UniProtKB/Swiss-Prot annotation:
Gene label: KIR3DL2
TM spans (from-to): 341-360
Cytoplasmic side: 361-455
Protein name, per record: Killer cell immunoglobulin-like receptor 3DL2
Residue ranges of every copy of the Ig-like C2-type domain listed in the record: 42-102, 137-202, 237-300
Amino acid sequence: MSLTVVSMACVGFFLLQGAWPLMGGQDKPFLSARPSTVVPRGGHVALQCHYRRGFNNFMLYKEDRSHVPIFHGRIFQESFIMGPVTPAHAGTYRCRGSRPHSLTGWSAPSNPLVIMVTGNHRKPSLLAHPGPLLKSGETVILQCWSDVMFEHFFLHREGISEDPSRLVGQIHDGVSKANFSIGPLMPVLAGTYRCYGSVPHSPYQLSAPSDPLDIVITGLYEKPSLSAQPGPTVQAGENVTLSCSSWSSYDIYHLSREGEAHERRLRAVPKVNRTFQADFPLGPATHGGTYRCFGSFRALPCVWSNSSDPLLVSVTGNPSSSWPSPTEPSSKSGICRHLHVLIGTSVVIFLFILLLFFLLYRWCSNKKNAAVMDQEPAGDRTVNRQDSDEQDPQEVTYAQLDHCVFIQRKISRPSQRPKTPLTDTSVYTELPNAEPRSKVVSCPRAPQSGLEGVF
């Protein structure tokens, strides 16, 4: 009797061991994806089927019963790399491991694994409220929104293999959005976030990712010190350098300025006094501002130290004492554009006046030259015509004085000049055996009959 009971108990144990996985027991494999379940279109993903008792062979299948040729009748070992992925690869997957000692030869189905393919719609926008720089223990709201009427929004942190958070989109004023609450913040929640959207009937075919948003947690390490060289008060145009230093061996220093969304970062350099320092050159000073610096380690780039004490940099000799904040209205930018227009208009007017002055000067010069030519005696012009008609190899050069300017003339011998005396009041002097030459002599005002100048 006891032997029969023992035999039946053994049979029941083996039957239960084979049936337990099929009944949803703990003896089922675990399916995971590396590097992430969120895969960009055209990318690759590695699917791994794990089993606590260990096996090397497994098979994959898709729950929506769509035909995937690469899975049909195939047995995989350790892992399977799927890609380049297309929208058809999006969906829910499971795996079964090979179990030689089970009744069916295969384990129970694994956990469902959702593979989401991105890049199928226009990207949404991601904002942080109250901001991306927060203290440990605070709560931040990440708002994902788009003018595309997405049914669901997904929030994913880079570097983790967990499924992204999912919320139903709310539509207001032609915009769909979802608010993801994260907190209380801890170092494990710091990192780079992106969000996606999906439309109805294609829940796992996601949009392109939003621009990355870094959520930084501060206040976990000792604060550094911030100083200015040559000092916090400088003249306009003077070079300024801000130095951030600490006894802690920070790898990176971050410099932020009030009113600016972006920070500057530099690698820390060990100094002789055993401090770690980074020097931020700001260049010629034009405007003042309030600065702070933080320290961080390379292993946790989004976990920063406490803020340094604020440092106010003042610039003297400059009418502006601060930069316009990016959150202020763009009226100041409009003033700059208006100033450029005024400067350009002034330059055009100046060039136009200069051109008019030049044309007027040319016109006056031409008019004066024409008046001088009109004042030349008729006899002198007649002599010139005769001179052109009769060419005598023996020529005499004369110089005519007219208003203290001697003008070169070439005429015939005196015997060939007209007999009628000329009324020209010009005075001539004969220069025999000399090369034709004209000489201009400046002289003071004198009677027209006088002759001044030396030949």
